[in-house]
Amino acid sequence: MNVYEKNTVEFVTVGVEFCAFVEKASEKSFDTFVPVLQKLLPFLYLKAAMVEKPMPLGEDELGTFVTEVDYETIRVAMSNILEEKDDFYNGEESTSISECVADVYQDIKDCISNYKTGQEDVMNDAIERCIDNFQTYWGT
């Protein structure tokens, strides 16, 4: 797979915008956060769905860039914005929008951070892992 293929580059571009937006959640109100998130998430989904999942190339472990502190900071910021609208029941258990979005953020941030290394085998494997997680978890 060419890591510079149009659909891949567009997915990474939208991923960068999504992460930048979510990282500034603590600066936003409900009325400025939710309408943008409602547009970004479907756009991110569409771009992820358009990427052809590559075969893994590298044998090295991919970098992890989102720490537990980062994750929790993002989750809490979104939970504070959403307040009582955060929790929902997914048919099996109670969960929250903020936790689901933080999960997606972690996956996308790790992917784009690995992609930014410029090492094509790392870039390829970062896309492969992210698209696999999209197909298995957050995109289903």
Model-derived regions: residue spans:
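N-terminal interaction modules that seed assembly of large macromolecular complexes
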Residues: 2-66
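Residue-level recognition of alpha-helical structural elements
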Residues: 7, 29, 33, 97, ...
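Long amphipathic alpha-helical segments
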Residues: 50-116
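A structural signal for well-ordered alpha-helices, especially hydrophobic packing surfaces
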Residues: 19-23, 41-48, 82, 108, ...
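Acidic, proline/glycine-rich low-complexity IDRs
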Residues: 1, 103, 107-140
